[in-house]
Design a protein with these regions (language model features):
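Nucleotide/pyrophosphate-binding catalytic subdomain
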Residues: 1-185
Length: 185
């Protein structure tokens, strides 16, 4: 069974939370499943990067902001792969360029067009947990683009579809279980 699991920034906000997620992921792996993990940036990393960018240039281009903002997810996936390896499980972190997540060229609000799954499939065949950056892609110029807020959820669902996954699990730390958008109901 192939499972795509997405965890948001608060789920990987610090070392303890990273290891908590790693242990949850390992349970599925040890049950014999192939596992792909999609992560957002840790905690408030994205907000911090935006604030720092505005301090440097309040009129920074969306292209440069996208280049900067992809760093948050790259940190998260590298830390997660390191945590998994420290727990004795083979893992690899991959970013949007390495996976070839092709998007439109609209900076800060791109749409996913195509995902090349070959690299992911190869790593899964080697029984590795594949940890992938959410929220980002690359355009036809090989520039990083971002999918906007909530983009990691989009990444997880798109990867699950492209990989023909058996399940796509999106974890969040809200109180209770919602069957509708609480802002609407």
């Amino acid at each position: 069974m192939l499972i795509v699991k997405k965890f948001g920034g608060s789920s990987v906000a610090d070392k303890d939370r990273i290891f908590n997620v790693a242990n949850r992921v390992i349970e599925d792996y040890k049950a014999g499943n192939d596992v792909v993990v999609v992560l957002s940036a840790m905690g408030k990393t994205t907000d911090g990067l935006i604030a720092q960018a505005k301090d440097i240039n309040p009129k920074a281009s969306k292209r440069e902001l996208d280049m900067l903002l992809t760093c948050g997810e790259q940190m998260s996936v590298a830390y997660m792969a390191m945590a998994l390896e420290s727990l004795g499980v083979p893992a690899i972190s991959l970013n949007a360029w390495q996976v070839a997540m092709h998007t439109t060229s609209v900076y800060s609000a791109s749409r996913l067009k195509k995902i090349d799954t070959e690299r992911i499939q190869t790593e899964l065949e080697h029984r590795k947990i594949v940890v992938i950056t959410g929220f980002q892609g690359i355009n036809k110029y090989d520039d990083y683009t971002t999918l906007g807020r909530g983009g990691s959820d989009t990444t997880a669902v798109a990867l699950a579809a492209a990989l023909h996954a058996d399940a796509c699990e999106i974890y969040t730390d809200v109180e209770g279980v919602y069957t509708a958008d609480p802002r609407v109901v």
